[in-house]
UniProtKB/Swiss-Prot annotation:
The lineage of its organism: Bacteria, Pseudomonadati, Pseudomonadota, Alphaproteobacteria, Sphingomonadales. InterPro entries: CheD-like_sf (IPR038592), Chemorcpt_Glu_NH3ase_CheD (IPR005659), Cytotoxic_necrot_fac-like_cat (IPR011324). The keyword Hydrolase applies. CDD domains: CheD. Pfam families: CheD (PF03975). This is Probable chemoreceptor glutamine deamidase CheD. Probably deamidates glutamine residues to glutamate on methyl-accepting chemotaxis receptors (MCPs), playing an important role in chemotaxis. It catalyses: L-glutaminyl-[protein] + H2O = L-glutamyl-[protein] + NH4(+).
Amino acid sequence: MAETTMKININNFKRIDVMQGEKQVSSEDDVVFSTVLGSCIAACLYDPIAKIGGMNHFLLAEPSGSDHDPNSLKRYGVYAMEVLINAMLAKGAHRNRLRARLYGGATMRSGFGDIGIKNAEFARRFLQDEHILLNAEDIGGTTARRVDFCPALGLARCRHVENQRPVERLEVVPDKAGDVTFF
């Protein structure tokens, strides 16, 4: 699904960072939500009539059977999606008008399983089950993303953060015995 690029200048907008486990909702014209994603997912929802939008940022799709800690719920997509939708409805959005954009779900490191893929599959399935139209997505791959979303306008920009070259490691030479002078 092709992504459209934001064609407005957001330099003077009030920037609100959306960190892992958080959600933000606004109807203000001069607000932009921003987040950085790897395997996590950010869902940007928007009601085009009410001009209300929101963004969440979740780490994992669904809790495992062994996770019974209520404090960890914020990490999961099922919680993040419901909380975002409820906050938007409380501000005046209508569920049947919601539109979505999805970002993230990258495979950042081998050995961590298919976390990004599972997150993306969950988000798509959730939107389908809730009859929320998916307008755009930038999902998968192996690079991190920076996402900016103007909630009142429903516009988003997603930029891939290219892999940086590895940090050069300096060799540490241990001190020789007897190199210390005591006073």
